[in-house]
Every structure is written in structure tokens, then in C-alpha cells.
Amino acid sequence: DGIPILSEDDLEHVIREHDVDEVWFSYSDVPHSYVMNKACQVIGWGPHFGVCSATRTMVESTKPLIAITAVRTGVGKSQTTRYVSRILKKLGKKVVAIRHPMPYGDLAKQACQRFETYEDLDRHQCTIEEREEYEPHIDNGFVVYAGVDYESIVREAEKEADVILWDGGNNDTPFYKPDLHITLVDPHRPGHELSYYPGETNLRISDLLIVNKVNTAEPEKVEEVLANCRAANPTATVIRCNSVITADEPELIAGKRALVVEDGPTLTHGGMTYGAGWFAAKQAGAAEIVDAKPYAVGAIKATYEKYPNAGAILPAMGYGDQQVSDLQETINATPADVVVEGTPIDLKRIITVNKPIANVSYELEEVEPGTIEEMVKAVV
């Protein structure tokens, strides 16, 4: 019957009812203090408490594999995956991406999923969060695999790939043994690279560390993060990159009241107060960034209550039909002239809104070009 999925709120009861011997912590993007607080609770209740090895849990592929991970959610993994994909395409390699799991429905049906077209996304009833990760790959002409059974997923991907890209989620460690491991570090959140689990592991085991978004970060914070990278992983190559932010129709934003919609996880467990959409609105000369909180309904209102750091920015939550409906209602009720969409997808495909939408894109740019391509060539 598989492993039962139970609420962590009931952990003490489950331990005592079943006389549990061991508890393994196996989710990501939480402060170190959270993990140890949980450990102290568990060992006080009786069982051993453990965290999983990064390397012993990796599946080996028969094809060259490049893993892209991060120290926190919302650093720029997906844009880096696209950047590396384009390098491989230029080298004449057939690329297949495997995305970190985001299963919310029938897990048996989602064991091994393959996405090549938008119709595939519809057929698998993908959430907004899944679409945010899959659509950019499809737009670039790449097949994406995801699901639950990551042994069978990689074996299917190997049948059609010269090179496999692991597109990591949250700040989790790779599920596959990489030939090249790239980790993104965020100067907008200096110190988080040493204080979040398991992101610090990625920092310490990577071959290439990318300090991203240096074009929008304070110089002293960039230097702090660079120093932490070199101290934690002295054998890694460390480079700086820009995240180049572009609005497709900046004229819709200039002088207008803008409602900024950002990638949900970046604003929620990622802990950010802004994202690419906020920068795009500022760059385009928005007269005002409208606070959506007073107009939020249902699940969106609950998200603001749980994550007050989101501030005036609207997180694009869409894990189910009700959240999508609440997102649409919140956008339509907010008195703005334009929606600045900082998510990686086109919301117009998902919801119907009563305002024009300016879509924002963000792409990786090496400050000193050439290092990433050189390291990619070395493993393929």
C-alpha cells in the first residue's frame, strides 16, 4: 500500500501509537534551527532522529548529468537551467530536463510524467507551480520529465537524451549523481547559504557556485556571500551572474498603478518580499505598486496571514482549482491599472482577468562570460 502520508501535527501521536524507532527528516528549505528543534522534540519522544545522506540517496545515470540546485528557493535555478540548456543545444546535444517533484494529486498516476507540449500539461492537470517550472523548458523546445518514481524517470529520460539536466526544487540536494553540480547563491539573502537545510550541503558539495542577481544586490552583500562561498567550499569555482529582467510591454506599466504578481514559493517559504516583477515595475516607472492584501480572498488571504513577508506583492498560489479561483478573484478585485506578472508562465492561459498583463522574463548573464560553457564542455 506504500507509505502512509500523515500530518506532521500528529507526529508525537504516531510515534507513541506505533512505537516508532527512527524518524527521518526529508523535506527542504527550512532553517537549521527548525531541523534541530524538530530533532529535540523527536528524541525526547524516544526515537532516533536522522537526516538523509546527499550522496547515498543519489541514483546514477548512464548519461552525462548536470545538476542545478540552490541554497534557497527563488535564487534562479530555472533561468540557469535554461542557460545551460542553450549551451548544450549549441553543442549539438539532445537535452532532457528532469524536474524535482511537485506531486499534489494521485501519486500513482504521476509515477513518471513526460511533458513536451502544453497539451501534456493540461492532460496531467498541472498546477500553476508545476507550469511555472515546465513551461519555460517547453518554450525552449526541451522535453521535461517529473513525477514520483525517480529511478524509472531517469531510465525513460536516458532513452532520448544525450545529456540530462536535473532542475532542482527548493534547496534540495540532487536526486541523481551529477557529473557537474551547479549551485545558486542569493546576495539578497546573505548568510542563508550557511543557515538553511539542506541548501548548505549543496554549497559544500558543488563544483560551481553562482552568486546570482549581483546587478540588483548591494555590493557589500555580494562580497559577503562570495566570502562565505570560498570559505565553505574552497575547491569550487565561484562566479558572479546578473539576472536580467525584462518586461515585454513596459509601456503598459509606465505611470500606472501596478499589481505585481510573483512566483508563489519565492514569497512564501522562500521568505522574499519582492521578485523579478517588483524590479520590472520599478524599472518601467510604475506610479504605484498596489497592495493586494485588502482585496485578497480565500486561500490567497490565508497565504498573506501565514507569510506576512509577502507585503504588497501577490503570490501566484495555484495548487488546486480553488486557489486558482481565489487568485483570479483577488486580481480582479484589486484597483490597479495593470498586472505585472513576474511568474515564469503566462497567467492568461490559466485565469481570466480584467486588466492588461505585462509579462516579465528574467535570464542569466555571466559577469565574465565563458566559465559555465567551459565547465559544461568538460563533462559532456
Residue ranges and their predicted role:
Residues 1-55, 324, 335-346:
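Phosphate-bearing ligand-interacting subdomains
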Residues 9-18, 66-69, 79, 86-365, ...:
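Flexible phosphate-sensing "switch/lid" loops adjacent to ATP/NTP-binding sites
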Residues 34-55, 168-169, 357-375:
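Repeat-unit-sized solenoid/scaffold elements
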Residues 46-70:
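Flexible, Lys/Arg-rich cytosolic regulatory linkers and terminal tails that connect or flank
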Residues 75-76:
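Conserved glycine(s) of the Walker
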